[in-house]
Curated annotation (Swiss-Prot):
This is Small ribosomal subunit protein uS12. Pfam families: Ribosom_S12_S23 (PF00164). The keyword NAD does not apply. One of its GO terms (cellular component) is small ribosomal subunit. GO terms for molecular function: rRNA binding; structural constituent of ribosome; tRNA binding. Keywords: Methylation, Ribonucleoprotein, Ribosomal protein, RNA-binding, rRNA-binding, tRNA-binding. Residues 1-24 are annotated as: Disordered. Belongs to the universal ribosomal protein uS12 family. The gene is rpsL.
Amino acid sequence: MPTINQLVRQGRKKSVKKTNTPALKGCPQKRGVCVRVYTTTPKKPNSALRKVARVRLTNGIEVTSYIPGIGHNLQEHSVVMIRGGRVKDLPGVRYHVIRGTLDTLGVSDRRQGRSKYGAKKPSK
């Protein structure tokens, strides 16, 4: 416990929160170009082929981002929008591609949770 005199001399240190998405530089989303689109396998208890893309952002930083949903149309040189949000079983993947914006198509035949996958409302 510091004395009053110690607090007067030095004050309290502000604890600085480390950001989980440093490449976004405080922005909610960023645009980028796909450098490589590939699949990778998740960590130990899980098994799958997760679709990911290496994206070079407009600020020059290159990040790995996850492509959510079933099926995608992304390839090299596709322009995508990314947001923050990690994938727990893929180490080093801290960003998500936003479906339904720029070159990324929304998920077709999606009925629930459509807004997260850029899917239009199905006609009756």
